[in-house]
């Protein structure tokens, strides 16, 4: 079965509509990425950045600043069947002595990524849904009810963007700024943040999970 995505022709980056690169760098001022280093290797003429070797995923480093500032004890997020965010949050709540509740779409068999979240101690709530926005509402309503902190889908939060820009520059080091960057695009947090970190690079995105709206794909 072939799937088609609706992708906007708008090339704006919603993170830069009212804020600048300097704003995000200032927001993360003093924060240092202490997560395990990614593998940044040359492969067939390309430079590959691999965060999977850390066991955290990219959001495991980018989400650190946000979770470090969360006052609530319980963190609430929506974990799809495939995705590293729940695993990343599992590590971060352990680091900052918090609890994690994950709302997951129910199916006949739990996915590998969801299972890892369970193994890492996340409290799970499975719901049968027609679309992810419905599950997001369940999760947000639950967070409001228990006084927890609801993390937007994809960790779409300015502190995550700020840490993402700072972390990328810290880990990239003194390498020349890349001319071309190829990235998957789901919520677009990764791609939009990298565009801020590397303002002169040309970006090529591969949509993998959802329709993309104005402001989400950037340049």
Across the structure, where does each feature detected by a protein language model lie?
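Small/polar-residue-rich loop-to-helix segments that shape phosphate-bearing ligand pockets
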Residues: 106-176, 219
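A short, small-residue-rich loop immediately preceding and capping a beta-strand
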Residues: 72-92, 96-104, 180-187
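Positively charged, low-complexity intrinsically disordered leader regions
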Residues: 2-73
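Active-site-proximal loop->helix
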Residues: 65-66, 87-130, 196, 213-219
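Cofactor-binding loop segments of dinucleotide-utilizing enzymes, especially the Rossmann-like FAD-
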Residues: 80, 105-107, 206-210
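Short internal alpha-helix immediately C-terminal to a glycine-rich phosphate-binding loop
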Residues: 60-76, 86, 167-177
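Glycine-rich phosphate/pyrophosphate-binding loop at beta-loop-alpha junctions
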Residues: 159-219
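Hydrophobic/aromatic beta-strand patches that form the interior of the parallel beta-sheet core
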Residues: 76, 101, 125, 149-151, ...
